[in-house]
Amino acid sequence: MNLMLTLFINTSLASVLVLIAFWLPQLNIYTEKASPYECGFDPMGSARLPFTMKFFLVAITFLLFDLEIALLLPLPWASQTTNLKTMLTMALILISLLAASLAYEWTQKGLEWAE
């Protein structure tokens, strides 16, 4: 009963906060708040300029490699396990996957900025 009450209260509170967050910004729409801010100066140009897909691809590549590196961080603690052979096999597979994905990005010219 206590668990159900806690889940209900947490779900209700989260739902109310999400509804308020979507409802409040629609009440007061100011042009000053909607305009871009450039360190106190008037904007030089439009803030809605399109950007090249290279930025997006570099960001996605960074996130993927960052995630794979984060998976390698617990390896020093995993080396203290009793089954060292399994840990080394998994680490080798993960490092091989990281190297293969880097080689794929390199061959597909995903790391080159100039076209």
Swiss-Prot record:
It is found in: Mitochondrion inner membrane. GO terms for molecular function: NADH dehydrogenase (ubiquinone) activity. This is NADH-ubiquinone oxidoreductase chain 3. Belongs to the complex I subunit 3 family. GO terms for biological process: mitochondrial electron transport, NADH to ubiquinone. One of its GO terms (cellular component) is NADH dehydrogenase complex. It holds the Pfam family Oxidored_q4. Gene3D superfamilies: NADH:ubiquinone/plastoquinone oxidoreductase, chain 3. The gene is MT-ND3. The keyword Iron does not apply. It catalyses: a ubiquinone + NADH + 5 H(+)(in) = a ubiquinol + NAD(+) + 4 H(+)(out). The chain crosses the membrane at residues 3-23, 55-75, 86-106. It is a multi-pass membrane protein. Core subunit of the mitochondrial membrane respiratory chain NADH dehydrogenase (Complex I) which catalyzes electron transfer from NADH through the respiratory chain, using ubiquinone as an electron acceptor. Essential for the catalytic activity of complex I. Its EC number is 7.1.1.2. The keyword ATP-binding does not apply. Keywords: Electron transport, Membrane, Mitochondrion, Mitochondrion inner membrane, NAD, Respiratory chain, Translocase, Transmembrane, Transmembrane helix, Transport, Ubiquinone. It comes from Ceratotherium simum (White rhinoceros).
